[in-house]
Amino acid sequence: MSNPLHGNALERVAPTARTLGRTVRLGARSTWILVADIATGRFPWREAIVQAWFFVTVTAIPAVLLAVPFGVVIAVQIGSITKSVGANSMAGAVGGIAIMQQIAPMAAALLVGGAGASAVAAELGARTVRDEIDALRTMGIDPQRRLVSPRLLAVTIVSPMLAVLIVLMSILASFLVAILGQGVASGSYWLSFGTFASVTDLAICVVKAMIFGYLVVIVAAQRGLEARGGPRGVADGVNAAVVIGIVGCVVVNVLISQLVAMFIPPRMY
């Protein structure tokens, strides 16, 4: 006699597993197409540049507006802790490493996941419900080659640029708060930052941002290409793309942070 609870659980898990499989397959095939087209000179660079510029225009100013409060909050919280233990000179090191390894890549993921993913899912979803995707296939044009791969490269390039911009603005805001509001000497701030922070921390930030951008675009493209039911279906796909993309970035960030802690020990002096 079958267990009804077991059957209901399988019915709920199976669609999610199938969707995950289609997303992984879309990501693998789009990546293969991207690499192959670049190697053979068939990649539509013009489309990729247009998409990259679009992502820059919709995320650059929000990145600055998001980075400054993050830097201020980090400086206030860390400053109060370091002051209580008599280690004001360590504010630059602690704040800088936290910004580079965690704050900046996650902030870039939020921006790309909010603005970039919604734009990709909305555009591809609108084309899907208008049967433009089917028309491309009828004409022998691969939608993944024509639409997904350029956006994949564009976001993968723009995401680390946003992360670096957030790092610069957040550290600058944190520095100003530390020296103007907490009495930290500017020399000791930068000395501790330069002593404990390294190029490896910045590289981790850039790699994280690239992975997050890649993940967000693949999820958004999958939701857009599978949109059904007219405008309502497009809206549902956009909402799902944003939520799933950001949640996926959070989960991946935990995994990457654990791997970094295991295999890349911090600098000790």
Where are these regions (language model features)?
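Membrane-interfacial helix-loop-helix connectors in multipass membrane proteins
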Residues: Q77-M100, L168-M210, V219-A240, V260-Y269
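Selective transmembrane-helix segments that form parts of the transport pathway or gating/packing helices
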Residues: V56, A60, V64, I103, ...
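Short, membrane-interfacial amphipathic segments enriched in basic
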Residues: S2-A48, R223-R228
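Short cytoplasmic-facing helical segments at TM-TM junctions of multi-pass membrane proteins
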Residues: A126-S149, G230-V234
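Hydrophobic transmembrane alpha-helical segments of multi-pass transport and channel proteins
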Residues: P160-V164, L168, S198-Y214, V242-V251, ...
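Hydrophobic alpha-helical transmembrane segments of multi-pass membrane transport proteins
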Residues: A91-D134, L162, V219
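Active-site cofactor/substrate anionic-group-binding motifs, chiefly glycine-
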Residues: Q51-A107
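Hydrophobic alpha-helical transmembrane segments of integral membrane proteins
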Residues: R145-L153, G245-I264
